[in-house]
């Protein structure tokens, strides 16, 4: 898929105005939104924010094997989508509990912000990577994680990451340690 092409129309996911039910019209220009010709409100399809945890233990970082599509069987970092109204740090803690059964502490501000596409339709995602440490529990794969492993800095470049930004986050977390 052409990474520069937006894989949806200006009006998706809205076809009708949520306020009054009028069929929406694509806005012109750069906005890529949809407008209601009756009430004048604008609607936008937004990129989904996601978080990734570079869980560090000394000279190693934890990577997971995806148990589900997209990219099943490939490596990534624990994490996932931020829910509506959820702070990214809270999303990170929730994802670590869901995927590994551990409690984590975020050690710093986001290390990396990256825009990438996710899934077969190429939906855009804004990913935020954080360096974290486990404060309680032992990692145990759950949810969409098939298994995990600890890797050293010299192994990172040879691994099959699903998304390149996860490789950069893992590498930077060990360099910053």
Spans of model-derived segments:
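A broadly conserved sequence feature marking short terminus-proximal activation segments
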Residues: 1-13, 112-113, 170-177
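Conserved Nudix-box catalytic region and its N-terminal flanking loop in Nudix hydrolases
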Residues: 4-7, 56-98
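Acidic, metal-coordinating catalytic segment for phosphate/diphosphate chemistry
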Residues: 6-52
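Conserved hydrophobic "DFG−1" position in protein kinase catalytic cores
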Residues: 55, 63, 132-134, 150
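A short Gly-Trp-Pro
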Residues: 57, 78-83, 127-131, 172-175
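Active-site segment of metal-dependent pyrophosphate-handling enzymes
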Residues: 101-138
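NUDIX/MutT-family hydrolases
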Residues: 140-170
């Amino acid at each position: 898929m052409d990474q520069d092409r937006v894989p949806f129309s200006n009006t998706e996911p809205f076809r009708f105005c949520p306020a009054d039910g009028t069929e929406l019209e694509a806005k012109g220009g750069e906005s890529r939104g949809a407008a209601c010709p009756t009430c004048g409100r604008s609607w936008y399809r937004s990129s989904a924010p996601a978080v990734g945890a570079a869980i560090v233990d000394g000279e190693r970082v934890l990577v997971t094997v995806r148990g589900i599509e997209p990219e099943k069987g490939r490596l990534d970092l624990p994490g996932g989508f931020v829910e509506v109204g959820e702070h990214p740090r809270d999303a990170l803690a929730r994802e670590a509990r869901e995927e590994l059964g551990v409690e984590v502490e975020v050690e710093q501000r986001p290390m990396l912000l990256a825009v990438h596409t996710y899934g077969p339709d190429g939906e855009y995602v804004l990913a935020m990577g954080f360096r974290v440490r486990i404060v309680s529990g032992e990692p145990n794969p759950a949810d969409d994680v098939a298994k995990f492993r600890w890797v050293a800095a010299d192994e990172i470049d040879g691994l099959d990451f699903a998304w390149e930004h996860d490789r950069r986050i893992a590498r930077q977390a060990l360099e910053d340690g």
